[in-house]
């Protein structure tokens, strides 16, 4: 029997956000307990909240918006690789040792998965180095998933990792919690909200063993 791993971070009022992004608010606007016929909530958050997909439009005005990412890129075989806690920057050299040629979806587990449950943002999270991003582009990867709110070094000042990937329409999925699944081959499903013309969107993401 297949096992399904839910990789998604819960979206809740006051939940973890990247510094400068909108805060999360989930408020009950109509309540049965107060005489309404149904419960209806008002939800406020940014497009890069929790587990989410970055589209090319995140950094390029003429880039592909999130609603136009082909579903074929978001669903299919994926490899989950893991790095020890002392790896703080995932470089091309790190990735070359994993024999990723032929893989279309690469998911990178680091010490960050343990940080996702913390209420406070941790700025020294592990990130994908620009040369690592270029290596993944060079071998034909179409989707990269990471386990913190950004794939880029905090306050990098250049956004080279994002731009290297998104310029080639490589989908970036951030905020994936890889605490439960062991490294290996899986079926990956990531379905961002269909926000028309938007630069990114929260998503429900799972691995199926």
Predicted regions located by residue number:
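Active-/binding-site microenvironments in catalytic and ligand-binding cores
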Residues: 1-209
